[in-house]
Every structure is written in C-alpha cells, then in structure tokens.
Regions:
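Compositionally biased, intrinsically disordered low-complexity regions
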Residues: 8, 29, 41, 46, ...
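Negatively charged, low-complexity tracts enriched in Asp/Glu with abundant Ser/Thr
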Residues: 1-30, 69-113, 152-166
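Amphipathic, interaction-prone secondary-structure segments
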Residues: 17-51, 104-134
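Intrinsically disordered, low-complexity regulatory segments enriched in Ser/Thr/Pro
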Residues: 45-86, 126-164
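Short acidic DE-rich linear segments
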Residues: 168-175
C-alpha cells in the first residue's frame, strides 16, 4: 500500500472508503477488487438503463475499472470535501453501503498489514485474500465476512475512531 498525498497515514481504510463511495455513486454491485502495482482493478455489475420499450428494466453489464494512484488520491480529496456537507449520497439502491463496508474492511486490513490484497463481494458478504508482510508472508491468508459481520463492524466503527472524551476534563494547553 502506498502513501497518498494528503493522507494522514498509509491506510487501506481511507483508500477503500473512497473507492467504495465511487462505486456507490455508479450503482455497482457484486464487486471484485484486486491490487495492482499502480493502483486497483475493480469489476462489478451495473444496471444500464435503456430508452427501449423492450428493455424497461435495464440490462446488467459487467464493468471493469482501473483506479490508478492519481485517481485514488483525487477520490480521497473529493470524499473529504463531501463529508462536511451533510448531503445524502445519491439514490443507488444501497447507496453508501460500499463506502462503509469497504471502510471497515480496510480497517481490518490495516490491522493485518498485508502487502497485497484481493477480495470479492456477493450479496453483502466478502471473501478476502491477503498476502501478509514479514517472514510469514509467503502464503496468502483468507478471511470471510458475512453480511451480518459487516453490519456489526459498521455499527462498532464509530467507537474505534476516536478515544472517548472525558467529561469535565480541564485542558492544560498553553500553560
């Protein structure tokens, strides 16, 4: 994992959160993500809407996207700017799901410290294949998360962001 300019630290959490937000905006489903030397390759299903009367429901097509390092840095900047505005994400079925799911998976990966990642999602469940750093890094490890696991991780995520503030604590700043 590379360090992205402006990122407070080298982390999968923020990178995947940004990619997930982009995928939510596109309405992409059933995601496959693989790390490449210069970024990430993502495949998923997208429903394309047609004006044809015989195609009222739209057509599901498989799309492949390549996110280069510069794209990821831009997505991260856009996500940070968007967060403070309080605007709801565009309606795309489960809009916002991939942003939050990818974020908690990224946090899990940050704890594992892999040097290479691959994962896929189907119906909200994820299978990860990680190549660990260090001397034991000569074999991939697998991790599986059900939709319920992801929901639980998302629910717990706010408690992991910042240490709880102490009420009534006095500051000694400036002394």
């Amino acid at each position: 994992m590379r360090i992205y300019e402006g990122s407070p630290r080298e982390d999968f959490e923020e990178v995947f959160r940004s990619i997930g937000a982009f995928l939510d905006q596109r309405g992409m489903k059933e995601i496959l993500l693989a790390e490449a030397p210069d970024g990430f390759i993502v495949q998923g299903l997208v429903t394309s809407v047609s004006n044809s009367t015989s195609d009222l429901m739209g057509t599901v097509v498989k799309e492949t996207l390549t996110f280069l390092d510069d794209d990821i840095a831009r997505f991260m900047e856009e996500a940070i700017a968007r967060r403070g505005q309080g605007e709801p994400p565009p309606d795309a079925g489960e809009a916002g799901y991939y942003e939050t799911a990818f974020r908690v998976l990224g946090r899990y990966m940050d704890e594992q410290r892999p040097r290479d990642v691959f994962f896929f999602e189907q119906e909200g469940s994820f299978v990860l294949r990680l190549l660990p750093m260090g001397t034991s890094g000569n074999r991939h490890i697998l991790a599986e998360f059900t939709r319920e696991d992801i929901a639980d991780m998302i629910a717990r995520a706010p408690t992991l962001r910042y240490p709880p503030a102490k009420t009534g604590a006095k500051t000694t700043a400036g002394r």
